[in-house]
Amino acid sequence: MLLTLFAFVVALGLLIAVHEWGHYRMAVARGVRVLRFSIGFGKTLVRWKPARQRPGQDTEFVIGAIPFGGYVKMLDERDAPVAEEDRHQAFNTQPLASRALIVAAGPVANLVLAVLLYALVNWIGVQEPRALLSPPVAGSLADKA
């Protein structure tokens, strides 16, 4: 029971991390400043800022106590005022196509993960037990055949 619950939480965490990573990577690729990448909600368990990030990025990475969700917080004028020199990095000032790509990148990342896992399972294969037949019982119809 506990092992099943642990496996569920790990699998869900993987799905959430891949989904949010899709949003994050596309936002960075489109030139949007990502303020926070969070897996989980609630109390912060782990927080770090990598020393090496792309110019203009100062992303804080967080793992929260409740692993049932995540988010990528981007620079956005709807949340707080944005300095004029940073407006080009705000999510809401991006062209519609860029915003659509960023929004779609999460589900696409999950789809790619599903295809890769499906291919991996089929490549490795699934071991099935062999059928073992004992000799027919003496005097049975199968024995007489």
Locate the predicted segments by residue.
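Terminal peptide-recognition signature
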Residues: H19, I63, G106, A142-A145
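Small-residue-rich helix-interface/hinge motifs
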Residues: L3-D86
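Hydrophobic side chains within alpha-helical segments
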Residues: G22-M26, I102, A109, L113
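PDZ peptide-recognition modules
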Residues: R78-A97, A109-A145
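C-terminal recognition in membrane/secretory proteostasis and scaffolding
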Residues: M1-L5, V121-I124
